[in-house]
């Protein structure tokens, strides 16, 4: 508290030689060789899945117990039972417990608020202090959007992109990231220069409640979620049956019968409205956008509309037009797009009064990519590294 790889199944800083990021990547390599053990939890509304990580690898067979979300005593009892079962099979004593849990919550204090999917959590449940009293080790709780972003920033997309840029001969290195999960809801987390943005009210990165571009009276999550894909497909196709996003994706692919145009539109509309929200968010963050979650498996239909929205234009009353973003957004999954992203617009400019020149890249740019390690892995690694970082700093 101190506060799915199968996509459809889980359906600019100029750093000189990039030395700062090389050091950060070496720092992560230290974690992969770290012998400290952290117990983790995947907290779903139906089941709890317990495990443990050492050196960046899962070292325990997962233990699965029902969440018992409607009975607080049973829920807390299963949390204790699950962690004790994991602890009993470990080669040494774990140094911490770290996991994601739904909000609202005061994550720093380890107190969980009134949860829609956990009816028994009402009036504030001191989950962190409870577990710390039982196990005698620090407990760190965050939301899944934050831990997804943290995992991608330290162990996933960000170090991978910076490595690829160096290999391409680019001097550009990135240190800021907006992590986005597309699934039951529209989650997000922000990492600025290796630091997770928690916010003064544990609400940092909450993008789900942004205004909806198409339906301004509603939140954007109404158009960026599993329920949105299902709703739009039904509206466009006239099909009164209930179709899951996986089925709608297969209709779009031509694998299953159905209205293919409506299926494609269901995902592209999500991309457009997610792109509108992300354009506002990334204007403040100015970094890499990485997308995960179950719906990211349909990225081929989501990302074109999302990129189009990011690179759209706006204007002034005098008729002037300019980009919605100061930066151009590139799709990093595409080889040609990545090559342009890496190349930028680097030139050399003279230093007045001397014979020397310095490098200058006037091309402001960001990248959009899909998580390669998957949301579950990124969240677990985010929880693991979050705990080790805080323990090392004595927080």
Residue ranges and their predicted role:
Residues 3-5, 14-15:
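Short hydrophobic alpha-helical segments enriched in small aliphatic residues
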Residues 19-95, 106-109, 133-137, 160, ...:
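ATP-binding/phosphotransfer module of carbohydrate and carboxylate kinases, centering on a glycine-rich
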Residues 1, 68-71, 123, 158, ...:
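A short local loop/turn or secondary-structure capping micro-motif enriched for an aromatic residue
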Residues 96-98, 104-218, 223, 376-395:
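Phosphate-binding/catalytic loop of phosphoryl-transfer enzymes
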């Amino acid at each position: 508290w101190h506060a799915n790889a199968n996509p459809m199944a889980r359906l600019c800083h100029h750093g000189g030689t990039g030395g700062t990021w090389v050091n950060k990547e070496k720092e992560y390599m230290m974690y992969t060789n770290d012998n400290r053990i952290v117990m983790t939890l995947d907290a779903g509304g139906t089941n709890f899945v317990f495990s443990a990580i050492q050196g960046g690898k899962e070292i325990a067979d997962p233990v699965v117990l029902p969440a018992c979300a409607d009975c607080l005593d049973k829920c807390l009892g299963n949390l204790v039972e699950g962690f004790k079962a994991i602890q009993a099979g470990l080669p040494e004593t774990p140094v911490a417990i770290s996991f994601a849990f739904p909000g609202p919550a005061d994550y720093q204090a380890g107190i969980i608020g009134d949860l829609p999917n956990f009816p028994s959590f009402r009036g504030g449940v001191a989950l962190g202090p409870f577990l710390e009293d039982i196990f005698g080790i620090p407990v760190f709780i965050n939301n899944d959007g934050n831990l997804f972003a943290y995992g991608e920033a330290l162990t996933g997309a960000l170090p991978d992109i910076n490595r690829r840029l160096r290999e391409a001969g680019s001097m550009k290195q990135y240190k800021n990231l907006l992590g986005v999960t597309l699934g039951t809801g529209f989650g997000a987390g922000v990492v600025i220069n290796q630091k997770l943005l928690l916010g003064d009210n544990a609400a940092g990165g909450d993008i789900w409640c942004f205004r909806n571009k198409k339906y301004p009276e509603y939140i954007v999550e109404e158009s960026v979620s599993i329920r949105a894909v299902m709703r739009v497909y039904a509206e466009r196709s006239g099909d009164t049956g209930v179709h899951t996003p996986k089925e709608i994706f297969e209709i779009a692919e031509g694998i299953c019968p159905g209205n293919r145009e409506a299926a494609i539109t269901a995902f592209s509309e999500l991309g457009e409205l997610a792109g509108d929200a992300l354009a506002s968010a990334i204007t403040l963050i100015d970094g890499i956008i990485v997308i995960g979650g179950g719906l990211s498996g349909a990225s081929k239909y989501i990302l074109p509309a999302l990129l189009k929205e990011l690179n759209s234009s706006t204007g002034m009353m005098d008729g002037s037009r300019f980009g919605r973003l100061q930066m151009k957004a590139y799709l990093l999954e595409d080889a040609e797009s990545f090559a342009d992203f890496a190349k930028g617009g680097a030139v050399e400019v003279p230093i007045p009064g001397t014979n020397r020149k310095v490098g200058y890249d006037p091309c402001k740019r960001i990248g959009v990519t899909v998580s390669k390690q998957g949301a579950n892995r990124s969240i677990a690694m985010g929880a693991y590294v979050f705990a080790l970082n805080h323990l090392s700093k004595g927080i």
